[in-house]
Structure formats: structure tokens, C-alpha cells
Amino acid sequence: MSQHDRYISPFSTRYASDEMQYIFSDDNKFRTWRRLWVALARAEMKQGLTNITPEMVAELETHVDDINYEVAIEREKLVRHDVMSHVYAYGQQCPKAAGIIHLGATSCYVGDNTDIIVMRQGLELVRKKLIGVLAKLAKFAEEYKDMPCMAYTHCQPAQPTTVGKRATLWANELVMDLNEIDHRLATLQLRGVKGTTGTQASFMELFKGDADKIRAVDASIAEEMGFDCEAVIPVSGQTYSRKVDAFILNALAGIGQSCMKFATDLRLLANFKEMEEPFEKNQIGSSAMPYKRNPMRCERICALSRYLMVDVLNPSFTTGTQWFERTLDDSANKRVAMAEGFLAADAILNIMLNVTDGIVVYPKVVRSRLMAELPFMASENIMMQAVEKGGNRQELHERLRQHAIAAGKQVKEEGLPNDMVDRIAADPAFGLTREEIVAGLVPENFVGRAPQQVEEFIANVLKPIFDANPDAVEQHASLSV
């Protein structure tokens, strides 16, 4: 079958990066299996198993990367067991060591430990891209920290903020996601050697009941695979707890939540014509409507984020339905859910890198929309001006309310501009000229500490992240479609 007459995941053809696809590839998995078999043999030899020699370990090391896939595939057709098929294939390349490969271990030794190693690699890539997105948002927030815009609550005009301050809200949620990813990486533990039901009975037999040697084997394998020697789960059944998968996918789904919020805001702002995602010179927005500038990147972020957030249910149910020391109904579900969860998170961050690299702002539209609402926002200031000239605060409050209702009616029912300033200027109770009122309608005076908040957030929250991860700051992503 060719690639055109079989189903191929869109994550592979459209969305996920080559780096993340390799992390979850068969090649990475089976090379990791072989690295684990080398680590096991070396650790057992160090603890005194005389039937394992340095020559055998060296032979195993020689063939970690040149996997004879054809042999493994043919063997699996016969024995219907992927691990034993690869033990056999490895043994064909390493005849001296063939008899000691996988000694004392169960399938989960390579399967589960590899899953943990692969997920760590995936989390590290996600982390790097997340920091890259934060760097672009920081640059954007700094550039637009002083530009006033309308803030919305209930999607209704509320009070002014700044374009840059709004960007810090997007960034702050991603910082929360980064903290969660860091926590998962810091607490991730290898399964180690636990045997068929977690009791390490086979290793007690190998080492004649010497528990210290078994603990040393665990520590040695952990170190060789890049973990702290103490980073081995203390107890398990046959598998590591599937709660680990649920925790990790929840962390990835958190990224989906934050990115979906960003993308939704940008889609709404595009409708307001205040801001929009990058739009290529030759990009076509619609096959029927040539004028369309659809926010397809942000729409894709929302689509993939929705998928990722729903994917969390898979490891949640899997964890709850593992019977006793393990059941195999985790395997098929986990194989799909975890890999595609990582691919989805990767795809989302690729688009985020692309979008945040070129957000378009239309300052005149931003200001025009703000000025259309500012007379309402400034009503209290106008009232204070009038009180200073001898007006009655309570009477003025009621008159402002009536003027606001009338001006709002003109905007909504007549489709005419907001004339509240003219109404107040014409009302002798206020004693203010139009010029005096307009002079007070300076948007920058209504944004509070927004510019300073941006500066403080970048300096106190984002800059330490960038200083600690300089290699992650400058990243770019191109999209295939």
C-alpha cells in the first residue's frame, strides 16, 4: 500500500514536528529498548553475575543502533510477542550475549521504562517550545505596553487596558503551564527492575536474596538512562502507575487550555479588526469569497486544543480500570492516547510560535473603538470636573445616567456615533464646554498601572525564565498547510 491508499495520521502529514514524531517513532523506542538491555546487563555484571562478561556487554553496545527490523518483524509473526521478537533479533546480532539479554526482566522492563524515557524527551521538547512562545509574547507585550485598548468583561466594554497588558494575561497562563511541565519533569521516575508483579522475585533469585544488589541494579540503570540514582519508583505492580500518564497528559492539556484562550481572543479581535494573525501574501481565505482573511491558524489551535483536552479522559479511565497488579486493557489505548497527546501539544505550540512571531495590530482601529466607548468610561471623571465647578454630585449622577441611556440608544437603535460628550456639553447643569470634556478623554489616563505591570511581569517572571534557558528563546516555526 502507498501513502495514498491507507490512513495516515494528520499529525504526521500536517501538524506535528519531525522532532516530536521521531521521539514517538519505532526507531527511538526500539533503540531505547536496546539501551535498557545494555544497562541491565552492565548493572547485573557489576553486581557479580559471573555469566555476564564485559565482552558480552560490549557486543550489545555495538548493535544498539543498527536494528535488524526485518528479523524482528518475521519473528513476531511466529511468536506474537513484540518484546521476545526483539530479544531474538538482538540475539541474532549478538550471539555471545544472546543468552543473557533481558535476564530476570519482564516485558514492562523495556516497555514501561521506555515509555517514561520517551515521555521525558517529549516534555523537554514541549518545554523548549513553550519558552519560545513566551519569548515572543514578551517582545509583543513590551512593544505594546503603552497602547490603550478597550478591556472587556462578559465580552462587553468595561474599562481601558493596554494591548501589552492583555498579552501578559496570555503569557501568565503559559507560565503556569511551564511550571506544571517542570514539576512533571522533576518528579518523573523510572520504573526500574520490578519483575512480573512488582515484587522483584526473579531478581531475588538471581542475586541469592541479596536486596542490596537489587537496589544497586535499579540505581545503576537509572543513572545510565539519565535519571538521578534515586529516581526509581518505590513500589509498583507489573507496570508503573498509569496515574503518571494522566498527570502528564493533564499538564499537556493545560497548554491546550491556555493556547485556546489566546487563539479565541485573537479570533475575536480579528473580527473587531483590531488585531489579527499573520496572513501570507498569496494566502487564500475562502474559495468563494476573495476578500476573506480567515484566522485559520488560530482556528487550528482551537481545534487541536479541543482534541488534546478531551484526550485527557483516556489515561484517566485507564488508571481507574487497572485491575490489581495490571491488566492489558491499558496498552492499546495508551499507545494511541499518549503519543497523539504529545503530537497535539507539539502541533499547537508550532502554530503558536508561528502566530506570535507576527501578530498584526491596527492602532487606529484600536484607538477608534476605544474612543467610541471612552465617554461612558470617563463619566465619573466628568462628574468630578462638574462638582469642582459647583455642581451637585447626586443630581449630576442621575443626569449622567440619563445621558448614557440616550447616547446608547442612539448608537444601538439609530446606528449613529456616540454623542454623549455633546449631550453633556449642552447640559447647563455640568457647566462644561465640549473642549473641556474632550481634554479629559485621554485614553492613557485610564489604563491604571497597566504599562508598569507589563514591565514588572517581564522583569520578575519572564526574564528569569529566559536567562535560565537562552537556547530556547529564539525559535521559529513554519506550517505545512
Question: Which residues are covered by each model-predicted region?
Answer:
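Long, amphipathic alpha-helical stalk/connector segments used for oligomerization, subunit docking
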Residues: Y307-R393, R399
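Active-site-adjacent "gating/activation" loops or surface patches in catalytic cores
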Residues: A211-R242
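A helix-coil-helix interface module used to build multimeric assemblies
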Residues: S2-A201, F207-A222, G285-S286, M296-R300, ...
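Short beta-alpha connecting loops at secondary-structure transitions
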Residues: Q21-S25, V71-I73, Q283-A303, E325-E340, ...
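A conserved active-site cap/scaffold subdomain adjacent to cofactor or substrate pockets
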Residues: S241-E274, Q283-A344
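Amphipathic alpha-helices that form helix-helix packing interfaces
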Residues: L40-A43, V126, L130-V133, L137-F140, ...
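Glycine-rich cofactor-pocket loops
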Residues: E142-G164, E276-K292, E325-A332, D357-M377
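Active/binding-pocket-proximal capping segment
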Residues: E276, R399-A406
